[in-house]
Amino acid sequence: ANKVIVLVPGSNGDESEIVYDIAVRIEGRLLALGASVFLTRGAKNAPSESERIAFTNTNSTDLFISLHTDTHTNPSAQGVATYFYGSDAHGVHSVVGERFASLVQREICARTNLLNCRSHAKTWDSLRLTKAPSVRVDCGYLSNVHDAKNLATPEFRDALAEAFIIAIQRLYLAAEDDAKTGTLRISDLRSAGIRR
């Protein structure tokens, strides 16, 4: 509750409708828990990356989440990967971004059958130029039959949305209030008084 979350659904080609739908599912759940949520685009419009970053930086954002799918020429490429701001060469990284990337990666893998492609530090503009902790999540490969089939179902998209919600909640929970990965449910958060 009382957190400002910016959701950035990717808008490139085939991923556009899928990640927008996932973002709307996340938005609804976050609103029900009392968070303030901003989607950076509607179903048909797509602001530029610099516009999304500027919007995020002017809205007291607590967390910036960029949602995407991936493709590859090799149809065997599959799985979920998360990215946070960091550069091993320069010895810098976003501590909160890295923690959230790890949490959402764990929750998605615990709740779905997506291959764990792990979390990675990157210096992409959307991660580097936002003032808030920022994470990009590639929720599977549309070029892979298995991932594409999963991403096409409402049940799978609901599982992804719940993974995001629980990861966000874990990010802000005290360690002693946390539960084993894959076991916490939205109803648990409500009964614990997380919702205002």
Range-by-range predicted roles:
Residues 2-4, 13-196:
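Active-site-proximal helix/loop segments of hydrolytic enzymes
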Residues 8-10:
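Short loop/turn segments at strand-loop or loop-helix junctions that form parts
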